[in-house]
């Protein structure tokens, strides 16, 4: 290759070139979808008047351009990245499930997902919603609400959900667990997660998670109240101690809770449980001094103390005094441990009772539907809004239709099967078959199976016949994809090597391994056969470059092909410079 570059840059070499050789190198590449036949190549000669004005540089530039264009045939599948026009992102729809007492749109006013996507807030209660969920189509929500005496009917596909309402309550005959299932069916992200919302539809089920934490941390770090569960009224015979608190089913805000002072009242309540056809729990009554509530919203913690003024055993009934207390490490451990249940709770609260004997008892944990109390209600709502925006920015990927800039642009393997590009030859990275020797007989000692002759070798046959197959007549279809690397590697040689004779080419090639005499017998028919010497010279030059490059990718078992390639290269140059 170094010799070829030096030889082509010599001005005296161009003067001795036969007519028709330069057009073969300068002819533009034919379309990959319709390969040119040899007759077509010979039908369109090009004038060389402009080329001889600077023979050495013109020939070298034409040859370099031909070599540069070589890998574009197999890599024609690569498409340059087109400039992406800015796409206006649609606003993300946030569905807030809460009553109408709180207008959540004002807490999300001016907030954007990832700083550039608007948030549209839709607010409704569970009773005002209906939906249809699909495997691939997501979830379509139908909303019918009444605002200021006007009925609003709207259908939309939410992107995120904030649950601020209980999905199930036996006391109010409200069961919206089917809606939670539909939202989960549609794969919608939520705060808290829909998985945890569904699990919080049963208080004994949640209490079982508290029992796990109790066994993990111990009674000193996690003082859980002693409780007994009954699936129905039949096992409810008696209680070990009185008074006891009986909780029927799943209810909120103190509903379904009864204080029983003696055995007779206990038996009466058992009959009520039988009529309710539900489960029940009993726990020892704790004479409390005050109630404790520790809430967690994201990474914000608050602790409150509530003291009954009216003297009712339920602190949420009658008059009570509420004040915020210091957040201790003990309280933080409680709420952090509870926030890990059901895959994680972004919003939760732990309720405990501080008895008059100075001991604490954890009685309940609440999720995102917890009521907000204290003087910092507005701050807590703003914290919830910030938490939702943060979760939306993490979970919702904007511009999913726009390809990522980190994705490399390259050829797609599935395009290689198209019929128009199937004639481009093997793709990059795939081994190419090596051609047999030009004009010489097959070697009998070769262990390889017989291979068919390539179209370019059919034109170089001694009989000079036309090729039978019309495929691949253009030079770029015979070149190897690795030829540009070969030309760049040879470009680093010293310029003073240009004075070496032509015979020095054989010193750069590896000696043949076997079958030398067989190939020498085919040299004479090769020199005297073809009726189109100029075309054959250009094709043999291109073919030699292709075979010399593909020999670098051969395996040790193909020494015969390497030797044939070397002989083909020598014969090509011998026929090229014979004039």
UniProtKB/Swiss-Prot annotation:
Residues 30-39, 47-66, 418-431, 453-485, 536-549 have a biased composition (Low complexity). Residues 28-90 are annotated as: B. Phosphorylation at Ser-9 dissociates synapsins from synaptic vesicles. It is a peripheral membrane protein. Residues 531-579 are annotated as: E. GO terms for biological process: neurotransmitter secretion; synapse organization; synaptic vesicle clustering; synaptic vesicle cycle. Residues 1-28 are annotated as: A. It is found in: Cytoplasmic vesicle, Secretory vesicle, Synaptic vesicle membrane. The modification Phosphoserine is found at residues 9, 454, 461, 469, 474, 480, 483, 540. Residues 91-398 are annotated as: C. Its main location: membrane. GO terms for molecular function: ATP binding. Residues 550-566 have a biased composition (Basic and acidic residues). Residues 15-84, 400-566 are annotated as: Disordered. Coiled coil: none annotated. It holds the Pfam family Synapsin. Keywords: ATP-binding, Calcium, Cytoplasmic vesicle, Membrane, Nucleotide-binding, Phosphoprotein, Synapse. GO terms for cellular component: extrinsic component of synaptic vesicle membrane; glutamatergic synapse; postsynaptic density; synapse; synaptic vesicle; synaptic vesicle membrane. Residues 399-530 are annotated as: J. The keyword Transmembrane does not apply. Regulated by calcium. The A region binds phospholipids with a preference for negatively charged species. May be involved in the regulation of neurotransmitter release and synaptogenesis. Binds ATP with high affinity and ADP with a lower affinity. This is consistent with a catalytic role of the C-domain in which ADP would be dissociated by cellular ATP after bound ATP was hydrolyzed. Belongs to the synapsin family. This is Synapsin-3. It comes from Rattus norvegicus. The lineage of its organism: Eukaryota, Metazoa, Chordata, Craniata, Vertebrata.
């Amino acid at each position: 290759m170094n010799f070829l570059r030096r030889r082509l840059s010599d001005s005296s070499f161009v003067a001795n070139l036969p007519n028709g050789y330069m057009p073969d190198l300068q002819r533009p590449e034919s379309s990959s979808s319709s390969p040119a036949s040899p007759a077509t190549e010979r039908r369109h000669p090009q004038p060389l008047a402009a080329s001889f004005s600077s023979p050495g540089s013109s020939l070298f530039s034409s040859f370099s351009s031909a070599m540069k264009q070589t890998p574009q045939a197999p890599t024609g599948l690569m498409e340059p990245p087109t400039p992406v026009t800015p796409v206006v992102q649609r606003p993300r729809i946030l569905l807030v499930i809460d009553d109408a007492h709180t207008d959540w749109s004002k807490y999300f006013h001016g907030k954007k997902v990832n700083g550039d996507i608007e948030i549209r807030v839709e607010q409704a209660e569970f009773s005002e919603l209906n939906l249809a969920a699909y495997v691939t189509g997501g979830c379509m929500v139908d909303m019918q609400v009444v605002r200021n005496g006007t009925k609003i009917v709207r259908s939309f596909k939410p992107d995120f959900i904030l649950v601020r309402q209980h999905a199930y309550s036996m006391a109010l005959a409200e069961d919206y667990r089917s809606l939670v299932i539909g939202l989960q069916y549609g794969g919608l992200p939520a705060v808290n997660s829909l998985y945890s919302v569904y699990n919080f539809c049963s208080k004994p089920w949640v209490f079982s998670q508290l029992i796990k934490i109790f066994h993990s941390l111990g009674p000193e770090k996690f003082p859980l109240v002693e409780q007994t569960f009954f699936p129905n009224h039949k096992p409810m015979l008696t209680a070990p101690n009185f008074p006891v608190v009986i909780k029927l089913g799943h209810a909120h805000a103190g509903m379904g809770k009864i204080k029983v002072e003696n055995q007779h009242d206990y038996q009466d309540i058992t009959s009520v449980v039988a009529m309710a056809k539900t489960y029940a729990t009993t726990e020892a009554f704790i004479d409390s001094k005050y109630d404790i509530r520790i809430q967690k919203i994201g990474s914000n913690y608050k602790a409150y103390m509530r003291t009954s003024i009216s003297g009712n055993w339920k602190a949420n009934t009658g008059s009570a005094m509420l004040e915020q207390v210091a957040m201790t490490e003990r309280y933080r451990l409680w709420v952090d441990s509870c926030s890990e249940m059901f895959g994680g709770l972004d919003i939760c609260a732990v309720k405990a009772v501080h008895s008059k004997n100075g001991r604490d008892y954890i009685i309940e944990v609440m999720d995102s539907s917890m009521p907000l109390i204290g003087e910092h209600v507005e701050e807590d709502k703003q914290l919830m809004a910030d938490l939702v925006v943060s979760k939306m920015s993490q979970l919702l990927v904007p511009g999913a239709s726009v390809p990522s800039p980190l994705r490399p642009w390259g050829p797609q393997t599935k395009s290689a099967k198209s019929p128009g590009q199937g004639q481009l030859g093997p793709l990059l990275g795939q081994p190419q078959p090596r051609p047999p020797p030009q004009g010489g007989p097959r070697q009998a000692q070769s262990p390889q199976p017989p291979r068919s002759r390539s179209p370019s070798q059919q034109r170089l046959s001694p009989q000079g016949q036309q090729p039978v197959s019309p495929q691949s007549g253009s030079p770029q279809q015979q070149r190897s994809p690795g030829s540009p690397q070969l030309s760049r590697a040879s470009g680093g040689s010293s310029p003073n090597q240009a004075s070496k004779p032509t015979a020095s080419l054989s010193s750069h090639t590896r000696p043949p391994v076997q079958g030398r005499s067989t190939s020498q017998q085919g040299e004479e028919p090769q020199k005297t056969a073809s009726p189109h010497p100029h075309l054959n010279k250009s094709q043999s030059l291109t073919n030699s470059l292709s075979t010399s490059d593909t020999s670098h990718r051969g395996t040790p078992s193909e020494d015969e092909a390497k030797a044939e390639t070397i002989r083909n290269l020598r014969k090509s140059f011998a026929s090229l410079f014979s004039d």
